[in-house]
């Protein structure tokens, strides 16, 4: 578990309840679960039990939990690349797993932990691919497409990287460009799987602060998978806390961040206090039993 402290927003809901009820809801995750069978002779294994929450345009939801807790499974269910065993995920009222590949690519942008380059490309060319994420062949791009790609780079503070080759970029620079490609899709829903992986502390804070501004300014609904307690606490509107496939709590960070609960989930002695921003800040402390 990484404890990143960034520099110096509700009532608790049970996992079975929807966290908000509002006509402006864009994303609705309703009692979603998932299981798989390792082989035909074994009973299905639950990787995610019933989970529910809602999110509006302009909000950031953090899916928080230790490794192998079901976070990435939930993200794939939201993206529609996995079909739920039960429940449903609705984007503007439509089940995401029922969307065609083209429609899904137009409405949902996904930033994976690792994005592989299929061929050498400059940063702006890589971002330009986001204009036609469902396409499988190269095509001539319009002036509008190019302008959107350039603007996406500017939105993430990477305009100066446009003409550089992707292979030359540092980890933080590459992550900005990958995010810009997702923004170039102009999606309704932006999904990120551990976007701060391999980034130093300053780059992690910078990325999440940028996401906060982008969500508000462009009315994106953002769902980010992370194990970074302080980043989620500082920048997320809601936190979905998961452990071993079970959704333990959903709500604002100030509601979810209860010391005993976090210690149970992360198996570490912790302290929780309010930071300068009024949001919870978590620190690792010496084992209270002196072990």
Where does each model-flagged region fall?
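Conserved ABC transporter NBD signature motif
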Residues: 87-95, 104
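Conserved ABC ATPase signature
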Residues: 165-169, 173
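ABC ATPase nucleotide-binding domains
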Residues: 265-291
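Catalytic Walker B motif of ABC-type/P-loop ATPase nucleotide-binding domains
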Residues: 190-194
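Conserved catalytic motifs of ABC-family nucleotide-binding domains
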Residues: 186
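Helix-to-loop junction immediately C-terminal to a conserved catalytic motif
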Residues: 79
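The feature captures the beta-strand-to-loop junction immediately N-terminal to the Walker
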Residues: 64-66
């Amino acid at each position: 578990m990484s404890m990143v402290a960034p520099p110096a927003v509700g009532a608790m809901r049970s996992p079975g309840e929807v966290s908000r009820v509002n006509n402006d809801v864009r994303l609705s995750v309703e009692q979603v679960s998932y299981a798989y069978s390792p082989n035909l002779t074994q009973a299905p294994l639950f990787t995610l039990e019933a989970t529910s929450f809602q999110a509006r345009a302009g909000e950031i939801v953090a899916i928080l939990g230790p490794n192998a807790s079901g976070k990435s499974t939930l993200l794939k269910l939201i993206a529609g690349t996995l079909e739920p065993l039960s429940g449903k995920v609705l984007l503007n009222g439509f089940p995401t797993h029922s969307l065609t590949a083209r429609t899904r690519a137009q409405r949902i942008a996904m930033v994976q932990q690792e994005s592989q380059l299929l061929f050498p490309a400059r940063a702006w060319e890589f971002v330009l691919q986001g204009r036609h994420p469902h396409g499988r062949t190269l095509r001539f791009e319009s002036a509008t497409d190019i302008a959107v790609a350039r603007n996406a780079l500017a939105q993430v503070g990477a305009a100066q990287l446009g003409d550089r080759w992707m292979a030359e970029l540092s980890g933080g620079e590459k992550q900005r460009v990958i995010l810009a490609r997702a923004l170039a899709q102009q999606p309704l829903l932006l999904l990120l799987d551990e976007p701060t992986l391999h980034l130093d502390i300053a780059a992690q804070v910078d990325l999440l602060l940028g996401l906060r501004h982008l969500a508000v300014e462009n009315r994106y609904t953002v769902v980010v998978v992370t194990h970074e307690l302080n980043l989620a606490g500082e920048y997320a509107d809601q936190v979905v806390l998961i452990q071993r496939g079970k959704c333990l709590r959903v709500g604002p960070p100030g509601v979810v961040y209860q010391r005993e609960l976090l210690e149970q989930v992360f198996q570490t002695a912790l302290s929780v206090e309010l930071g300068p921003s009024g949001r919870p800040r978590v620190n690792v402390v010496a084992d209270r039993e002196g072990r």
